[in-house]
């Protein structure tokens, strides 16, 4: 058994779910190999992932045929199966870093933003890597304020928090710093000449350009001094005194050798060498002067130096140790000396200093690193490094802690206040920060910074979403809902709705971030070879390719450990690639096709819009067994027939024909039959005969686009015709809005017998005679048919002898013989009005009269006397002929004569009434026959009448000249009055327009009077009078004058066009006329689009409204008023007959009504006769309004009941259950939309007067519940009006007991009330359109419903469109379907939440039953667009508009579509739950008498069994299988 879908749910997919759908990961961007044309491995078309390209064949061809089904080839890894799997097997791309789903980011309001309380801009800054978001602040403080979770940080702020506050000061080349590297500085201190620190902190050098190494030199040297002069010490510091000599002293050589003198800045060394080996080294302190020179040979005992006064150590040399040997009066000192020798090294930009300031180095240590090893600086000896000339100085906010012993932290550690740094706990940090240990200076620096966790990109957002505790957030927001501020409550409600959507649906917020991207099956994004060997591919493949390329590049960069900035950029590009795939162009510029500017179609584009999946492929599809061709008129056809070209029928009915050919033996089998048909020339006559048999009894559907209402598709019995054109019955043209100037129509064949039966019963053209919009005939005589019938039923009126009086008939006849009196001239005989024809030709029966016409004795238009059914009729043979035609068609002469009015010619309206009355009295079949008869004779007589138009038929009346002269005189007077200042410019303009309007009217009357009196059979006049073609305005322009014309702005030219078309226009007149004509053309084009869109919106809002039950049982009703206030006097007057009919016809009476002695019972369907009775009663003052059931008050959910809806207007009988009345309503309102004007009338620059919206824009404004531009001020309370006037403004007070309401108005406001008037709430005080929302607040829903129906009807009536009120009521009901919660009571609802009235009412019933507080609500008025988008069915809403928004909301809430309306069922390919698809029809069984009897017996038996005593029932056992 086929499974039936009952509900459809949409939800978010988790990363695991996406991977579970996938058959493998797509790792490469390749599609197919350009040489072998086979899919690349791991690419977007890989057969291992998506399945084989050929049925039951692996990629390498090892396994072929079905017997290997399910086997995976060990060579190529492809599963042997059908290739169709490539339409539904998905792959996936594993993202290197998570990416956000753009729908949940860019939706308004953003779903992710709402959950995390981030604005759209903030969210975007994080996702696209321009700001960090804080995941864990770890106590961080920024500018004295604690950092909070989810706070956004700029790059600078993040660096300051993470790495400390720091400022960089660049130094020019060659300038040395005034502070040392690592020195503490204060704000305002000079760091280098002209460079001042703006921060307290530690100065750190960046890129020193010069390094000075102070190498440590050591030497052991001797010195003999007088013992008495020696200042004895164990060691000497630089500059200390060695000896105080009272008299000069000579220092002598104690060995012989060659002198080597090494001079220092102060002091010197003297080395004696023998054979290049040093034999003695002497130290010459400051105060001792050498007496020998370098290279001199000295003897033992020779003086080397002379000393005087104080001998001291040089400033740069110290003696670390002294050994003294006393010899008599002298002492020999052995000094262990140390001193430094500085050496500078330049550091080039490509070199890098690797040791800090003040560091000690050993010989061989590297000081400066370089790319080229030869450029590196290596320590020559032990020494201390000093840095100079930094490129910049970095001042870091840090605390410096000196220490003595051990350090307990190491560089890079993070510490908090109170953490131990050194000296066994004596030194502790008092800030958060990062440690830098400086062993040179014995300090620990703590750079003030925080171990803050802040990140960028979707990764950060995903983490935050994962951490969300939705339950806690819900509680927090519920508390926020109690806040006094309305704005705060509204914001909390929006967030709460999203939070609850996640909680109730079981979706997780982090699923809005993608870790893996699903890859669409390849056959849904195909790549095909086009002519010339090139490939055409779906845009999706390009988008996937970009994504894979970027993903792979990011993976590679991450593996290589690329710098953060490069990774960040690549991640951003990956996010953008995911965005482009999901919804190209939603953010930033769209990705375009290389080589053109066309944006690529992303997944969103494939779904949404007119060309999207929903509207293009699901709501409507192209079908097989269809064709189209040009239409031509088929006057010989019956109403239910159409002419189908033979060749077309051959193709459309091919399968049936092939079977028939095989059955009849024309061809041995189907294959031969098909070949026979393909060879066009070989088609034999018996094939055509077989085709005739095949189509016998079948119907086809004809459709003309645009299909504005259901009569745009009708069923016809095909009749085979020669040629290539479809022949259409002339009387269905009106329903199709077809004409024969090149229109085309489509043909469809219903295939199954069910479809054939449904088309024949429901859709046959002969079964659709009345309009579903108004109940008036749609199939009615028109154009030539009217002309022909009018021609034969018109009577001649002749002037000759008119008005003469005769004593006897004989005298009159004699005068006629003499030629004094015309046959049809009105005369009096013995005081009775008659004519010669009536006296001369008296026929015993109608047949005689027609015989006289046939013999040329009388004309069809002459008035004669005929006896019929015992009555003496004075009428024309033409009218008798017409009655005969009708009688023959309906096969009932008595009824025919009753239906026809014999005293008037048959024009458009009387023919329409005839058809309608025939339908009511005789039914559908006979009416169809009548229509065919009228068609046949109408064409016949319009042909034989020879009516044609010539230029001379446009007769200009003689009075025109004098009327124009008169107008010119009055014009002069107006101009003079203006010149003299008696009129303002505006008054002058208005009076001139008034004058010309009156003149035009006079000329029009003159034109028609002239025709009527002098040319009654003038073709122009006949056409206009009969309603066949043309209207009085057109005739006026042909024969009278064109009149006033419109300016492009919409105002009127004050200069009229005086000429008629017959006379011809002057150049100026032609020019003036052109504006209006052009505006008309432009209007039509705009109107068509707007009207179509309105229809679509109406269908979307009403499609679920179906007649679902017989009676909803409501006691509510609406009262249809029979009177209305006059526009000018405001006094009540009876409404127009047509308006009352549109409000009452076909409705069910809600209360019993007794009028004019007739009792109309409650529950009665009001026929047209009943309506006319009620109108008569209203005229007699017996009744003011009629209580009727209405869709507005119906209690049926998702539809209406039979009683509240009333008649199915197209059948003039109560509506059937299952009828899709919502769509009928939408089509009925939308279809005439193109006939409405587009005009916005301009008031011509009057100050303060706004434009009055009319026509289609007004209808749209009302259905969209927009606030009108020129708004009327309405009273909010009942009370008495008091008006106060000041210099600047008007004040209108409405006063009721103890309460007054003031309305301040501009001075030029046009009031509708005067002092002392009593007004009700909702009544307008000024002119203008009422704002329906204000009316709803002031007067409640019933007033708004009435207002909307009445205002919409006004626009349609103005254009002469007939439309039943109930169609508008159905739409208005959908607009009033929603309510807003004002107090949630004890429910889970939220204040301000909008939901359907039904839901709230059902909830309240439950709450009251449980003894809880019910929900308080107020009614809402919603425009049709908003109402359609708010529908519970997400499928319907998504296929209407804003697809992404609807799907986003639905997915988050995990919405289920219950498939109640029509659209959602069409989308799923199910039968629609209306008409024959409704459960009521599908599960209703038709039973015969025998079955009925069996059911009745079984029922009786069941009742008896119940009534038997319990004991007996226990004993008797049912026989198995015998069940009632």
Curated annotation (Swiss-Prot):
InterPro entries: DNA-dir_RpoC_beta_prime, DNA-dir_RpoC_beta_prime_bact, RNA_pol_asu, RNA_pol_N, RNA_pol_Rpb1_1, RNA_pol_Rpb1_3, RNA_pol_Rpb1_3_sf, RNA_pol_Rpb1_4. The keyword Magnesium applies. Its cofactor is Mg(2+); Zn(2+). It catalyses: RNA(n) + a ribonucleoside 5'-triphosphate = RNA(n+1) + diphosphate. Binds 1 Mg(2+) ion per subunit. One of its GO terms (cellular component) is DNA-directed RNA polymerase complex. One of its GO terms (molecular function) is DNA binding. It is an enzyme of class 2 (transferase). Zn(2+) 2 binds at residues 1112, 1194, 1201, 1204. Belongs to the RNA polymerase beta' chain family. This is DNA-directed RNA polymerase subunit beta'. It comes from Thermus thermophilus (strain ATCC 27634 / DSM 579 / HB8). The lineage of its organism: Bacteria, Thermotogati, Deinococcota, Deinococci, Thermales.
């Amino acid at each position: 058994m086929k499974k039936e879908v009952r509900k459809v749910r949409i939800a978010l997919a988790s990363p695991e779910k996406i991977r579970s759908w996938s058959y493998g990961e797509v790792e490469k961007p390749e599609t197919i190999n350009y040489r072998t044309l086979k899919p690349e491995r791991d690419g977007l078309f890989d057969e291992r992932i998506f399945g084989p390209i050929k049925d039951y064949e692996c990629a390498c061809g090892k396994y072929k045929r079905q017997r290997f089904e399910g086997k995976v080839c060990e060579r190529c890894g492809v599963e042997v199966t059908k290739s169709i799997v490539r339409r539904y097997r998905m792959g996936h791309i594993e993202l290197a870093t998570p990416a956000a789903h753009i729908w949940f980011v860019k939706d308004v309001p953003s779903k992710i933003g709402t959950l995390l309380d981030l604005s759209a801009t903030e969210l975007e800054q994080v996702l696209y890597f321009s700001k960090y978001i804080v995941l864990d602040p770890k106590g961080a403080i920024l500018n004295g304020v604690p950092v909070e979770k989810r706070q956004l940080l700029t790059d600078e702020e993040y660096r300051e928090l993470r790495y400390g506050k720091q400022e960089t000061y660049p130094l020019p080349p060659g300038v040395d710093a005034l502070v040392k590297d690592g020195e503490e500085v204060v704000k305002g201190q000079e760091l280098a000449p002209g460079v001042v620190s703006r921060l307290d902190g530690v100065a750190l050098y960046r890129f020193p350009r010069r390094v000075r190494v102070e190498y440590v030199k050591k030497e052991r040297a001797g010195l003999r001094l007088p013992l008495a002069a020696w200042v004895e010490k164990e060691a000497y510091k630089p500059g200390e005194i060695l000896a105080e000599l009272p008299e000069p002293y000579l220092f002598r050589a104690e060995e012989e050798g060659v002198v080597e003198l090494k001079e220092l800045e102060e002091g010197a060394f003297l080395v004696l060498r023998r054979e290049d080996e040093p034999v003695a080294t002497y130290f010459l302190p400051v105060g001792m002067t050498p007496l020998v020179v370098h290279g001199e040979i000295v003897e033992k005992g020779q003086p080397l130096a002379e000393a005087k006064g104080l001998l001291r150590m040089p400033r740069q040399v110290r003696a670390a140790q002294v050994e003294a040997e006393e010899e008599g009066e002298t002492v020999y000192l052995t000094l262990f000396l140390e001193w430094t020798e500085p050496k500078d090294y330049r550091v080039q930009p490509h070199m890098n200093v690797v040791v800090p300031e003040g560091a000690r180095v050993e010989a061989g240590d590297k000081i400066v690193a370089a790319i080229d090893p030869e450029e590196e600086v290596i320590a020559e000896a032990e020494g201390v490094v000093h840095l100079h000339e930094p490129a910049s100085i970095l001042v870091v906010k840090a605390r410096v802690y000196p220490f003595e012993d051990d350090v307990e932290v190491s560089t890079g550690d993070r510490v908090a206040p109170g953490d131990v740094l050194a000296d066994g706990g004596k030194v502790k940090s008092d800030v958060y920060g990062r440690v830098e240990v400086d062993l040179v200076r014995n300090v620990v620096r703590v750079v003030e910074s925080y171990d803050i966790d802040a990140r960028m990109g979707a990764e950060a957002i995903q983490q935050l979403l994962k951490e969300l505790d939705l339950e806690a957030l819900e509680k927090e927001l519920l508390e926020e809902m109690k806040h006094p501020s309305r704005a705060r409550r509204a914001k909390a409600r929006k967030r709460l709705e999203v939070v609850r959507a996640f909680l109730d649906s079981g979706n997780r917020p982090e699923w809005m971030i993608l870790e893996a991207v699903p890859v669409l099956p390849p056959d849904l994004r195909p790549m095909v070879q086009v002519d010339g060997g090139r490939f055409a591919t779906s845009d999706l493949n390009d988008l996937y390719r970009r994504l894979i390329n970027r993903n792979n590049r990011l993976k590679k960069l991450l593996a290589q450990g690329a710098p953060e900035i490069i990774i960040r950029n690549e991640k951003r590009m990956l996010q953008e690639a995911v965005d482009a795939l999901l919804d190209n162009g939603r953010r930033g510029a769209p990705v375009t096709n290389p080589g053109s500017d066309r944006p690529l179609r992303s997944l969103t584009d494939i779904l949404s819009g007119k060309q999207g999946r929903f509207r293009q492929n699901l709501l409507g599809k192209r079908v097989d067994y269809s064709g189209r061709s040009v239409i031509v008129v088929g006057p010989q056809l019956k109403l239910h027939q159409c002419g189908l070209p033979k060749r077309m029928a051959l193709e459309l009915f091919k399968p049936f024909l092939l079977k028939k050919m095989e059955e009849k033996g024309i061809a041995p089998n189907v294959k031969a039959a098909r070949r026979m048909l393909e060879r066009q020339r070989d088609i034999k006559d018996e094939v055509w005969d077989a085709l005739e048999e095949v189509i016998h009894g079948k119907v086809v559907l004809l459709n003309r686009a645009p299909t504005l209402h259901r009569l745009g598709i009708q069923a016809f019995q095909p009749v085979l015709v020669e040629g290539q054109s479809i022949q259409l019955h002339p009387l269905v043209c009106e329903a199709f809005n077809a004409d024969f100037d090149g229109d085309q129509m489509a043909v469809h064949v219903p295939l199954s017998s069910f479809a054939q039966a449904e088309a024949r019963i429901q859709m046959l053209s002969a079964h659709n005679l009345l309009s579903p919009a108004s109940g008036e005939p749609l199939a009615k005589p028109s154009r030539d048919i009217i002309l022909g019938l009018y021609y034969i039923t018109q009577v001649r009126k002749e002037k000759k002898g008119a008005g003469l009086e005769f004593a006897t008939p004989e005298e009159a006849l004699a005068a006629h013989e003499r030629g004094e009196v015309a046959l049809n001239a009105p005369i009096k005989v013995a005081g009775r009005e008659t004519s010669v024809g009536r006296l001369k030709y008296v026929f015993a029966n109608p047949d005689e009269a027609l015989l006289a016409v046939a013999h040329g004795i009388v004309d069809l238009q002459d008035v004669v006397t005929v006896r019929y059914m015992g009555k003496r009729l004075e009428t024309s043979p033409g009218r008798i002929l017409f009655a005969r035609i009708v009688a023959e068609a309906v096969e009932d002469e008595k009824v025919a004569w009753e239906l026809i009015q014999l005293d008037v010619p048959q024009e458009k309206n009387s023919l329409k009434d005839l058809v309608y009355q025939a339908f009511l009295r005789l039914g559908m079949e006979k009416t169809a026959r009548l229509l065919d008869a009228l068609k046949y004779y109408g064409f016949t007589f319009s042909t034989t009448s020879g009516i044609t138009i010539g230029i001379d038929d446009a007769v200009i009346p003689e009075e025109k000249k004098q009327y124009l002269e008169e107008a010119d005189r009055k014009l002069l007077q107006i101009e003079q009055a203006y010149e003299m200042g008696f009129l303002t410019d505006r008054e002058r303009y208005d009076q001139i327009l008034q004058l010309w309007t009156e003149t035009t009217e006079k000329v029009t009357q003159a034109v028609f009077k002239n025709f009527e009196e002098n040319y009654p059979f003038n073709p122009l006049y006949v056409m206009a009078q009969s309603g066949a073609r043309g209207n009085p305005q057109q005739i006026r322009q042909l024969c009278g004058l064109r009149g006033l014309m419109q300016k492009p702005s919409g105002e009127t030219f004050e200069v009229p066009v005086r000429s008629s078309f017959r006379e011809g226009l002057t150049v100026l007149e032609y020019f003036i006329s052109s504006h209006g004509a052009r505006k008309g053309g432009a209007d039509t084009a705009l109107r068509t689009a707007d009207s179509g869109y309105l229809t679509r919106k109406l269908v979307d809002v009403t499609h679920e409204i179906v007649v679902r039950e017989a009676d909803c049982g409501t006691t509510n009703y609406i009262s249809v008023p029979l009177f209305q206030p006059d526009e000018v006097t405001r006094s009540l007057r009876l409404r127009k007959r047509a308006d009352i009919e549109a409000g009452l016809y076909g409705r069910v009476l809600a209360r019993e009504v007794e009028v004019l002695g007739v009792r109309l019972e409650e529950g009665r369907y009001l026929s047209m006769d009943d309506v006319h009775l009620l109108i008569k009663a209203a005229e007699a003052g017996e009744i003011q309004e009629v209580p009727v059931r209405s869709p507005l008050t119906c209690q049926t959910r998702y539809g209406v009941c039979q009683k509240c809806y009333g008649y199915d207007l197209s059948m003039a009988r109560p509506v059937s259950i299952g009828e899709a009345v919502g769509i009928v309503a939408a089509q009925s309102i939308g279809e005439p939309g193109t006939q409405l004007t587009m005009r916005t009338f301009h008031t011509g620059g009057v100050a303060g007067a706004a434009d009055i919206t009319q026509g289609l824009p007004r209808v749209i404004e009302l259905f969209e519940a927009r606030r009108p531009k020129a708004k009327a001020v309405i009273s909010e309370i009942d009370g008495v009006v008091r008006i106060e006037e000041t210099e600047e403004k008007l004040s209108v007070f409405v006063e009721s007991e103890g309460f007054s309401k003031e309305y301040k108005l501009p001075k030029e406001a046009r009031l509708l009330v005067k002092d002392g008037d009593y007004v009700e709430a909702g009544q307008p005080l000024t002119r203008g359109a009422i704002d329906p929302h204000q009316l709803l607040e002031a007067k409640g829903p019933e007033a708004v419903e009435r207002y909307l129906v009445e205002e919409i009807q006004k626009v349609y009536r103005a254009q002469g469109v007939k439309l039943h009120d109930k169609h508008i009521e159905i739409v208005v009901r959908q607009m009033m379907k929603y309510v807003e919660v004002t107090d949630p009571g004890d429910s889970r609802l939220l204040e301000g939440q909008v939901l359907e009235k039904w839901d709230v009412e059902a909830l309240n019933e439950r709450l009251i039953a449980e003894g809880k507080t019910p929900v308080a609500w107020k009614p809402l008025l919603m425009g049709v667009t908003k109402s359609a988008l708010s529908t519970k069915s997400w499928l319907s809403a998504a296929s209407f508009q804003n697809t992404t928004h609807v799907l986003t909301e639905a997915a988050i809430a995990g919405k289920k579509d219950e498939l109640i309306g029509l659209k959602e069922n069409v989308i799923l390919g199910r039968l629609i739950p209306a008409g024959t698809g409704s459960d009521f029809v599908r599960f209703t069984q038709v039973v015969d008498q025998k079955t009925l009897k069996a059911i009745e017996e079984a029922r009786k038996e069941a009742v008896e069994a119940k009534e038997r005593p319990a004991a007996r029932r226990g004993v008797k056992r049912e026989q198995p299988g015998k069940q009632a």
